[in-house]
Swiss-Prot record:
It is a peripheral membrane protein. This is ATP synthase subunit beta. GO terms for molecular function: ATP binding; proton-transporting ATP synthase activity, rotational mechanism. The keyword Nuclease does not apply. Belongs to the ATPase alpha/beta chains family. Disulfide bonds: none annotated. The keyword Membrane applies. It comes from Idiomarina loihiensis (strain ATCC BAA-735 / DSM 15497 / L2-TR). InterPro entries: ATP-synt_VA_C, ATP_synth_F1_bsu, ATPase_a/bsu_AS, ATPase_alpha/beta_chains, ATPase_F1/V1/A1_a/bsu_N, ATPase_F1/V1/A1_a/bsu_N_sf, ATPase_F1/V1/A1_a/bsu_nucl-bd, ATPase_F1/V1_b/a_C. It is found in: Cell inner membrane. The gene is atpD. Pfam families: ATP-synt_ab, ATP-synt_ab_N, ATP-synt_VA_C. It comes from the Bacteria.
Length: 461
């Protein structure tokens, strides 16, 4: 293949000069062949004319200098796919980083692929039970759907995601792919050991491009994970694809965008924000052969949901789980906001009348409580009508019953985790709404699984 020379380096963006008749194509992978940086991969982004191409480095450019040779591989970045990737940690290029020997893959695939066509796509309305009460009730997940976990810093996106992986891996025994995009290395490490301890590691492929990696890695690692998930789907499986965190994918694009010579747009984001997001999200879809159900953590800068990055992500999702700092500060975990979270599945034709009516009833009572809060703060509970007093009392019980102990948080809380079936969830909330538990103290509903546990707890209070 043709060889070129490095002519300019600005951070993670490198310009190379190739012979005029052998200029690499966009997305071709170039490999550095000398200077102690053998194996460094550069991905072509632009052809600037005159034989010069501009590329993003998939690794640190420390020690790279002008005049160093790089050869064109003639293909885009290829990563290992298939069953051999299960239980392994890989980087953006598919190299193992868990010190457990080579992957030994039977097949490699390009990380750049076209999204499935209209004919290939399928849509079913099957629910995916997660065992987390607030999610199953208020914003149920569809099998083969896309879910976003929205939240600011430190409200529990990663813990919620780990609980979902644990529940789905153990209760549904499917394959999962986890892409760690620009998150803390410590969390990636915890995550690996957590999966190992709960014996689900052999069902998960892990792809990491953490915070300390150059922007090229963080920009492409989501595509690496997605390619592995697509392979499982094309084999006819139902696969889960987890991304933590989709915001860092956008951020990596922002970091290289200006260096690639693009003019920044709103809030300094790249002008290609919507297109970059679309390229990733449109590939996460279910076909007639298999399904990809995706759960994506979305960091919300400064808790502002109108920021261009979370706002662009919203458009692609079937269900949104919004985590709220005010709820977390009350000690209610998972800190899901039942009034802000939505799902397309929340439709009586999909989930049935009983589930729908219960979910609507819960939201109605909580909304009423929210409206009355100001009056209570100024005048106290005594000034409310009997009807409103009852509403407030039920709302506070519901609010506490929406909390639940997590399996992955057992080490911190000391309380054993709970998996609650959808049937039990609906029965519990319906009972509270119907007034069956009006005589029980609200503490009895805090951090329990089913309503039966709340009744038991009330006896000991």
């Amino acid at each position: 293949m043709s060889q070129g020379k490095v002519v300019q380096i600005i951070g993670a963006v490198v310009d190379l000069e190739f012979p005029q008749d052998a200029v690499p194509k966009v997305y071709d992978a170039l490999k550095v062949t000398e200077g102690g940086l053998e194996g460094l991969v550069l991905e072509v982004q632009q052809q600037l004319g005159g034989g010069i191409v501009r590329a993003i480095a998939m690794g640190t450019t420390d020690g790279l200098r002008r005049g160093i040779t790089a050869k064109n591989t003639g293909e885009s970045i290829m990563v290992p796919v298939g069953k051999k990737t299960l239980g392994r940690i890989m980087d953006v290029l598919g190299n193992p980083i868990d010190e457990a020997g080579p992957i030994g893959e039977e097949e490699k695939m390009s990380i750049h692929r076209a999204a499935p066509s209209y004919e290939e796509q399928s849509n079913t309305n099957e629910l995916l039970e997660t065992g987390i009460k607030v999610i199953d009730l208020i914003c149920p997940f569809a099998k083969g759907g896309k879910v976003g976990l929205f939240g600011g810093a430190g409200v529990g996106k990663t813990v919620n995601m780990m609980e979902l992986i644990r529940n789905i891996a153990i209760e549904h025994s499917g394959y999962s792919v986890f892409a760690g995009v620009g998150e803390r290395t410590r969390e990636g490490n915890d995550f690996y050991h957590e999966m190992n301890d709960s014996n689900v590691l052999d069902k998960v492929s892990l792809v990491y491009g953490q915070m300390n990696e150059p922007p090229g890695n963080r920009l492409r690692v989501a595509l690496t994970g997605l390619t592995i998930a697509e392979k499982f789907r094309d084999e006819g499986r139902d696969v889960l694809f987890f991304v933590d965190n989709i915001y860092r994918y956008t951020l990596a694009g922002t970091e290289v965008s200006a260096l690639l010579g693009r003019m920044p747009s709103a809030v300094g984001y790249q002008p290609t924000l919507a297109e970059e997001m679309g390229v990733l999200q449109e590939r996460i879809t279910s076909t007639k052969t298999g399904s990809i159900t995706s759960v994506q953590a979305v960091y919300v800068p400064a808790d502002d949901l109108t920021d261009p990055s979370p706002a662009t992500t919203f458009a692609h999702l079937d269900a949104t789980v919004v985590l709220n700092r005010d709820i977390a500060s009350l000690g209610i975990y998972p800190a899901v906001d039942p009034l802000d979270s939505t799902s397309r599945q929340l439709d009586p034709q999909v989930i049935g009348d009983e589930h729908y009516d219960t979910a609507m009833g819960v939201q109605e009572v909580l909304q009423r409580y929210k409206e009355l809060k100001d009056i209570i703060a100024i005048l106290g509970m005594d000034e409310l009508s009997e009807e409103d007093k009852l509403s407030v009392s039920r709302a506070r019980k519901i609010q506490r019953f929406l909390s639940q102990p997590f399996f992955v948080a057992e080490v911190f809380t000391g309380a054993p985790g709970k998996y609650v079936s959808l049937k039990d969830t609906i029965a519990g909330f319906k009972g509270i709404l119907d007034g069956d538990y009006d005589d029980m103290p609200e503490q009895a509903f805090y951090m329990v699984g089913t309503i039966e546990e709340a009744v038991e707890k009330a006896k000991n209070l």
